[in-house]
């Protein structure tokens, strides 16, 4: 069983938008009421109140206007405060005490799974709204066949409404062909967003840089207006829409690239980059934030779990760029302006990012072989390039699973192929007698 969610934009009219705004207001009121009530009881020296007690007290003093919104959204808002308070006391350094929600805070409310209904692939029936609301894109087939957990309606910074459908489904469907089981190492960078060990790359569109002048202009215009005036709000609305476009453009690019990588490879290796530390370099901070390294890692993690791909991480201090993939020699210095890696030991000339991606994949394979078979013999026998070449020749169709070349495998089928691949790779490594270094 896999738990996931789908976020879809709602196409609403002014009447529906007003009803959604009212539901958000009720949820915000319930959250603030729970916070104020908890503070009042604590100040009076009363015992700690539970979530159930807060809900019961809130329901006893409901007024007429509250019944115009779903009861579950207000109950969940109270529960959200209790959970936020619990997180604060468990880890006060990371989570501050929950603040009151203001009108300008992010607007959202929760809907229980039995209070809303998916009418068809492009319409959904929400509580207290007479007609079904149209969706901007169709609901996924696995969402229709799976079990709905809950719904969350929210308003984005671009003034558009979205619904997130959380659901669980049984992963028994075929996902990919047996010929799509390669190996790839990924080197993330500023000039090229993702350089693959196969020689392919994902270009960095530099979306922030392209719109920097326009965003700066909007910020200057806002600074010259009276705060919260009509003109200020109009400019801020345009500024938020442009920021939303940039965010969605970057997310769409990374979604498409990571899906293709995970679908076509059974082993993916990446560097565990310290993004926060990299951002401390003020000369590169803007360019690094434009890349979305953290988003790439998050997307690869959950998509690897979905498709049965093995995601391997290499330590952040591994010198992937300075190391020669041909002989293993490590350079003392390598400036950012050097786009080609030239090895003084073996004479290898290769693109520096491709060289780094090969080293990332080889190091990940070295670590995984050591973890599975408790020996580091592969590192003594093979150079990074030789191990990657051997592993690539062994990847593909499993010898132990009885499926023909045109049969489609499920997520569990690929996991079997990954285990079989490492067993075959270890047999080749153990039988190798020639030291390649």
Give a label for each model feature:
Residues 165-172, 241-264:
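Phosphate-interacting basic helix/loop segments used at nucleotide- and nucleic-acid interfaces
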Residues 1, 161-184, 341-342:
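A short acidic-Thr-Gly-centered motif at the start of a beta-strand
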Residues 1-76, 436:
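Gly/serine-rich nucleotide phosphate-binding loop at the start of the catalytic core
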Residues 261, 266-272, 312:
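Short glycine-rich phosphate-binding loop at a beta-alpha junction
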Residues 3, 287, 291-437:
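Positively charged, low-complexity nucleic-acid-binding target-recognition regions
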Residues 12, 179-197, 300, 353:
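Gly/Thr-rich phosphate-binding beta-strand-loop-beta motif of the actin/hexokinase/Hsp70
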Residues 192-237:
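Metal-dependent catalytic core segments for phosphate chemistry
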Residues 51-157:
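Acidic carboxylate diad motif detector
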């Amino acid at each position: 069983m896999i738990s996931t969610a789908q976020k879809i934009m709602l196409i609403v009219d002014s009447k529906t938008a007003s009803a959604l705004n009212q539901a958000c207001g009720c949820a915000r009121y319930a959250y603030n009421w729970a916070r104020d009530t908890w503070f009042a009881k604590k100040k009076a020296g009363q015992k700690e109140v539970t979530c159930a007690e807060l809900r019961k007290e809130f329901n006893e003093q409901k007024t007429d206007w509250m019944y115009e919104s779903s009861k579950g959204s207000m109950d969940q808002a109270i529960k959200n405060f209790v959970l936020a308070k619990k997180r604060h006391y468990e880890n006060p350094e990371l989570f501050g005490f929950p603040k009151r929600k203001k009108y300008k805070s992010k607007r959202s409310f929760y809907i229980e799974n039995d209070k809303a209904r998916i009418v068809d692939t492009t319409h959904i029936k929400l509580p207290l709204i007479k007609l079904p609301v149209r969706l901007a894109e169709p609901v996924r087939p696995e969402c229709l066949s799976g079990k709905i957990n809950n719904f969350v309606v929210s308003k984005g910074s671009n003034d558009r409404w979205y619904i997130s459908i959380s659901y669980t489904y049984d992963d028994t469907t075929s996902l990919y062909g047996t010929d799509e089981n390669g190996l790839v190492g990924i080197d993330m960078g500023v000039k090229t967003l993702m350089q693959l060990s196969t020689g392919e790359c994902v270009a960095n569109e530099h979306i922030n840089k392209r719109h920097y002048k326009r965003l700066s202009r909007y910020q200057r215009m806002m600074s010259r207006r009276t705060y919260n005036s009509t003109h200020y709000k109009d400019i801020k609305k345009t500024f938020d829409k442009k920021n939303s476009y940039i965010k969605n453009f970057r997310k769409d690019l990374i979604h498409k690239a990571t899906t293709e990588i995970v679908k076509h490879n059974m082993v993916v290796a990446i560097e565990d980059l310290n993004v926060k530390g990299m951002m401390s370099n003020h000369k590169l901070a803007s360019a690094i934030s434009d890349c979305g390294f953290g988003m790439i890692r998050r997307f690869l993690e959950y998509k690897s779990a979905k498709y049965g791909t093995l995601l391997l991480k290499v330590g952040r201090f591994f010198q992937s760029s300075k190391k020669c993939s041909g002989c293993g020699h490590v350079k003392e210095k390598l400036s950012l302006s050097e786009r080609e890696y030239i090895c003084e030991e073996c004479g290898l000339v290769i693109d520096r990012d491709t060289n780094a991606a090969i080293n990332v994949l080889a190091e990940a394979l070295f670590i995984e072989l050591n973890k599975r078979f408790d020996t580091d013999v592969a590192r003594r026998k093979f150079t990074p390039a030789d191990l990657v070449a051997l592993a690539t020749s062994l990847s593909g169709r499993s010898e132990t699973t009885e499926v023909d070349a045109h049969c489609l495998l499920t997520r569990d089928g690929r996991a079997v192929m990954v285990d079989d691949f490492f067993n075959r790779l270890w047999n080749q490594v153990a039988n190798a007698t020639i030291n390649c270094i």
